């Protein structure tokens, strides 16, 4: 309701009471409007069903085909990766087995070499020990032989010094032998 307050002119926008109503609400044209709606919807249905729906259906089918193709490709890649993983695990197990076999073989070889070297060293040491024992025994025998002669000479000198007479050599030898053996022989 806009009114102009200008002098001399007045404009009204209201509809006077005898004029027709808004056409969609007019009861006289209601039946023709329903027929127009039915024709418009039928025409819209035909246009949509003949042109729009086939295009949308084609797009949907194309998209479904693309999705199925992508899923099949993804499954193929997954199967391929599963096969590669199994092959990797098989090769890894085989490599582990080979490594253990090589390690065992190396350990056995080194143990055999070590045993052979140890036995050779033991034989060498045994030979050296036997030689050393023989040398010691020979030296002891030689030393004991010298001890007997020295003891006999010393005993003879002592007895001669104390008694003033030369003792019997056989008697001194028996006394020295008895003394060296650890026994006492009264002479």
From Swiss-Prot:
Alphabetical list of Pfam families matching this protein: ATP-synt_B
GO cellular component entries: plasma membrane; proton-transporting ATP synthase complex
Annotated InterPro entries: ATP_synth_b/b'su_bac/chlpt, ATP_synthase_B_chain
Residue intervals passing through the bilayer: 31-53
Subcellular location: Cell inner membrane
GO molecular function, one term: proton-transporting ATPase activity, rotational mechanism
Top-level taxonomic group: Bacteria
Compositional bias (Polar residues): 1-13
Keywords of the record: ATP synthesis, Cell inner membrane, Cell membrane, CF(0), Hydrogen ion transport, Ion transport, Membrane, Transmembrane, Transmembrane helix, Transport
Its membrane topology: Single-pass membrane protein
Region (Disordered): 1-21
Chain's role: F(1)F(0) ATP synthase produces ATP from ADP in the presence of a proton or sodium gradient. F-type ATPases consist of two structural domains, F(1) containing the extramembraneous catalytic core and F(0) containing the membrane proton channel, linked together by a central stalk and a peripheral stalk. During catalysis, ATP synthesis in the catalytic domain of F(1) is coupled via a rotary mechanism of the central stalk subunits to proton translocation. Component of the F(0) channel, it forms part of the peripheral stalk, linking F(1) to F(0). The b'-subunit is a diverged and duplicated form of b found in plants and photosynthetic bacteria.
Oligomeric and partner information: F-type ATPases have 2 components, F(1) - the catalytic core - and F(0) - the membrane proton channel. F(1) has five subunits: alpha(3), beta(3), gamma(1), delta(1), epsilon(1). F(0) has three main subunits: a(1), b(2) and c(10-14). The alpha and beta chains form an alternating ring which encloses part of the gamma chain. F(1) is attached to F(0) by a central stalk formed by the gamma and epsilon chains, while a peripheral stalk is formed by the delta and b chains.
Cross-referenced PANTHER family: ATP SYNTHASE SUBUNIT B, ATP SYNTHASE SUBUNIT B', CHLOROPLASTIC
Protein family membership: Belongs to the ATPase B chain family.
Designated name of the protein: ATP synthase subunit b 2
Protein species of origin: Afipia carboxidovorans (strain ATCC 49405 / DSM 1227 / KCTC 32145 / OM5)
Gene transcribed to yield this protein: atpF2
